[in-house]
Amino acid sequence: MPTTPVIEILDDSSLLDDSLIEEIISDNNDNVIHPTEIDESIEISIPYVNDKTAESNSTSLGNSQKESSLIVTQTASQRKRILDEILSDDLSISTDDFSLDAIPKQTSGRTRDSQKNDSALYESSQEKASIASSPNRLIKKSSSERHKKSQSIDSKDICIKSPTRKINLGVTESMQTDVLFEDNNFNNIECTQETDLSFSTATADTPTVGFKEITFKHKESTNEGLNSHNFSDSIFERQRLKQYITNIRDITETESQELYNKLIHTEKGLFNAVNQTPRDNFKAREDIIVDFSPSLLSFLDKQTEILKSILAPATIQKSIHDELPRIRFFRKCHSFYDLQHDFFFPSNYKIVEENTTILYFDSKEFFVKYKEDKRSLFEKLKEIERDNYEIILVLYDLAKFKRELEKIEETKYRSRVQSQIYDSQQSIQQNKVTTPQSDYGLKKFDVEQRLRYINREWGLKIHIVNSHNDFVHSLPNLCSIIGKQRMDPAIRYMRYAHLNVKSASDRKDTLKKTINEIGKVPDIKASAISDIYSSFQSLLHDFEAGSLKASSDGNYLMSEALEKRLHKIFTSTDPNEAVD
């Protein structure tokens, strides 16, 4: 009579081999009314150690089934009852040990037969694997809820080093449907199989967001003109032109047309005079008033007569403000500028201030103020800059100040050398004699660094002069530039500064220079074309008619490439389009 196999429990963790259990259940399926539900997810995920008893008993069980079906039925019932007791007693223990420390004690590197076939693992995992939301709950399997639970994974159960991780990754990587992660901090974060278990999903800033809805928004400037980048915008263009053109006024189309018609019929000469661009420096300085602070004007007392002569016909006056050695520029305005229509219309006499100002400092005095009271100096300069002034900082005697600093450095160096040669008492007495009384706390190298810093961080334009005479003789040039900038076409038409603009004497010269520029045509060939077509209008007329005139020798007047380029010029509506 065959012996009854015994199940030996080793380390409270050993179970029967899966192949043996499946063989017994499949052979005696008719005798078992309600098969006991077994948690096969744990069976698949954890290979148990010391399973020698089950392996040795598998042979005897196979022999016993051949001898008597009744004995086999009783044996199967006994084994199932013992197995139920083992599972009910040890299931909670095995689930509590789902940690990295517990796995080496209960498992080995041996792979079960059921895990060798990846396709079988995938099929069984799709039907059986489900993970609870808490480690303290029992892992259950239900045919009705199995598919729903496989579609949701709680964040607490997503552990990289969990023993069930091997099965879960196999399921999620091959899953065709989308996976939905539910967590307290990230509600309904939807992702596909390509983005499954993505770290970027867990670190999203928004609590509810879809991957397709993620967009990156750039912070826009509060300045509307800067956001639109439209140089034709009146507000943005006014802000730019106001720095150079004084007395700007916005008027409507009707008002501009009425003023223009009135002045053309009644005061045409006055209208032309206020719109004439001064080309002479003497003419440009007529309406300029140069305002000197009292201290600066008295400091340049010896240069006053020279200033009056070289700045003429500009007016020199004394300012009422004397906080800084400052020079300001004013203009006598007899007209206002219509920004929308680019006209200067005559108006009542008015004095306006230009945006350029000059600060004239002795180099030593400036760096002493910078070293002792930097904050006060910075606040005064920023107060001037707040009114949209272009500040020019003029320093004189900078080379002299550098030589003085170099001399101080040399004296200090000699003192250190002598202190090492002689004893301390002699060096102390000698230092009292040789050390200079004024130490500015600067080196020659520091001066250049400070000037670069002030130019970059404070926004000042720095100009160096060697003497008062150099500064005085440089003022007329600056005064002329300020006098011309209000009428300068390059400033008024800055919206077209990106275009390559060239001037011509007449229509024929304009056509000749255009052909020479766009077609790289030599001057002789361009002159031959302009002799036949005296203007763009005549050339356009023949282009529209579809027939161009021939040259004097009977050949084509221009090449096919030049014809295409001219045709693009005539038909294009985009001024920025390239002419190929």
From Swiss-Prot:
Biased composition (Polar residues): 55-72, 122-136
Cofactor(s) recorded in Swiss-Prot or TrEMBL: Mg(2+)
Pfam families: ERCC4
Domain of life, per lineage: Eukaryota
Cellular localization per UniProt: Nucleus
Region of interest (Disordered), ranges: 53-72, 103-155
Molecular function GO terms recorded: crossover junction DNA endonuclease activity; DNA binding; metal ion binding
GO terms for cellular component: Holliday junction resolvase complex; nucleus
GO biological process entries: DNA topological change; double-strand break repair; mitotic intra-S DNA damage checkpoint signaling; regulation of reciprocal meiotic recombination; replication fork processing; resolution of meiotic recombination intermediates
Keywords annotated in UniProt: DNA damage, DNA recombination, DNA repair, Endonuclease, Hydrolase, Magnesium, Meiosis, Metal-binding, Nuclease, Nucleus
Entry annotated with the keyword Nuclease: yes
This enzyme's EC code(s): 3.1.22.-
PANTHER family (alphabetical): CROSSOVER JUNCTION ENDONUCLEASE MMS4 (PTHR21077:SF5), EME1 PROTEIN (PTHR21077)
Functional description taken from the UniProt entry: Interacts with MUS81 to form a DNA structure-specific endonuclease with substrate preference for branched DNA structures with a 5'-end at the branch nick. Typical substrates include 3'-flap structures, D-loops, replication forks and nicked Holliday junctions. May be required in mitosis for the processing of stalled or collapsed replication fork intermediates. May be required in meiosis for the repair of meiosis-specific double strand breaks subsequent to single-end invasion (SEI).
UniProt family annotation: Belongs to the EME1/MMS4 family.
Subunit structure: Interacts with MUS81.
Name used for this protein in its record: Crossover junction endonuclease EME1
Species this chain originates from: Candida glabrata (strain ATCC 2001 / BCRC 20586 / JCM 3761 / NBRC 0622 / NRRL Y-65 / CBS 138) (Yeast)
